[in-house]
Amino acid sequence: DSTNTQSLAEAGNYPYGKVHGVDLWPFWMDEIDGNAEFVQRYSEIGKEYFDKDILPSDMGYTWYVGIKAICEAAKTTADDLSPEAMTNALSTVHFSTLYGDDLYFRDFDHTMAHAYYYVTAVEDTTGKWSIPVGDVYAVYEGDEMLPTKEEMEEYASKNNYTFTDLSAK
């Protein structure tokens, strides 16, 4: 997330090549159709409303995908936009974004299944970004990456936690 990495990168102290993790928004990947334009429009929001550039962040991706989910759910229940109707619609809607097809919320835990980019943080060699970008090791879809219901139940049981299946509600 740029809010955590920008100051380290600007000071020349970012540990490039030593940070590995999951990135939700591969903002640096211009080869994804529409990504460069989306990132540019996101940055323009900062210029328009805050008089400064807004660098890509996980929060930006979260806003995008959350609003997209709400809009797609509303299309399926346009006659009733009550909280109950929207909650039900969100639990069954499937949609696509720039970063993947068939995004949805799992019924048993309401976690969104979407693409996860496993990356090593590297310095941008193009000169476009002042913040770390990712060297993509693998891209996983939600169902490949997230624990199954059975795995979550087993983990909860082993650790004396209560697992609540939200699909049963």
Language model segments and positions:
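Extracellular/periplasmic periplasmic-binding protein-like sensory domains
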Residues: 1-65, 76, 132-167
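Residue-level signal for nonpolar/aromatic packing positions in well-ordered secondary structure
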Residues: 42, 66-70, 118
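Segments of small-molecule ligand-sensing domains
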Residues: 49-60, 71-140
